[in-house]
Regions:
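Non-catalytic cap/lid and distal C-terminal segments of serine-dependent acyl enzymes
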Residues: 1-250
């Protein structure tokens, strides 16, 4: 299940998961048309995403899908280039060992061109990315590859949300919290890693945990997804400076 997949500890070196699997998935680059959602001008532009297809991808089967967002200074290709393609190897090994079912992973980017010098300057782009995903990237990806979306209009995306996840590291986690805040109708599963919820301002999850928790809870109560209609798996290493914000949020 998605819950088991997201909550399972990821141990890279144990059992040789950092090695190439015999059955290797493939990485596909996708350029797509979108708009400037961050600056409000609506100017047309092109963005890029990379897509992991599991070994033996079959057009006759349906696949769960996850959108995984990089951190600051990253790009759409970072996850599949870092550590000599470690993420692809890990996914291949986890599928081969039966830890997760074969699935599709999409790595988008909130950057256009060079990353911002200061990571807080990326905030408006992180906030805008979930809308770009729903309006532009999900329709392109999930009409080309066989997910559980029967259609890729707003209704079709919502109906298939229980088969769609979003996650990210650092500023990608900030993006994930924005997705929970603003596009809950498109995703059921959320995996923010080492990043704060900034819906009420920079570092609000750490500095204003009561207000942030209440804000997120109200968002859910006002939606159609209260109770079991969503799942959040948030994590941060204990030596990571971001861990303090998760400690505060978890307490609420």
């Amino acid at each position: 299940t998605w819950r088991q997949s997201l909550a399972r500890p990821l141990v890279l070196t144990l059992y040789g998961y950092e090695q190439e699997a015999e059955q290797r998935g493939s990485i596909v680059r996708m350029d797509y048309d979108t708009r400037d959602y961050a600056e409000g001008c609506g100017a047309s532009r092109t963005n890029t995403a990379y897509i992991y297809l599991p070994y033996g991808y079959d057009e006759q089967k349906r696949y769960n899908i996850m959108y995984l967002v990089h951190g600051h200074y990253g790009t759409a290709s970072t996850y599949f280039e870092t550590e000599n393609g470690m993420l692809r190897k890990l996914l291949d090994q986890m599928i081969a060992h039966g830890d997760i079912a074969p699935m599709i992973i999409v790595t988008p980017t909130y950057n256009y061109g060079q990353p911002t010098a200061n990571y807080t300057d990326a905030d408006p782009y992180c906030k805008a990315l979930p809308q770009e995903l729903v309006n532009d990237l999900i329709p392109v990806v999930e009409s080309r590859y066989h997910t559980y979306a029967e259609t890729t209009d707003a209704e079709g995306i919502e109906v298939s949300r229980k088969h769609r996840a979003i996650g990210g590291f650092s500023m990608g986690a900030v993006t994930t919290w924005y997705a929970f805040d603003e596009t809950l109708s498109a995703f059921k599963w959320f995996m923010p890693i080492s990043g704060d919820c900034w819906s009420l301002g920079w570092f609000a999850g750490m500095n204003r945990p009561d207000e942030t928790a209440a804000y997120l809870a109200d968002k859910v109560r006002q939606s159609a997804y209260a109770g079991t209609g969503f799942y959040i798996w948030a994590a941060s290493g204990t030596s990571d400076s971001a861990s303090v914000s998760y400690t505060h949020l978890r307490a609420h």
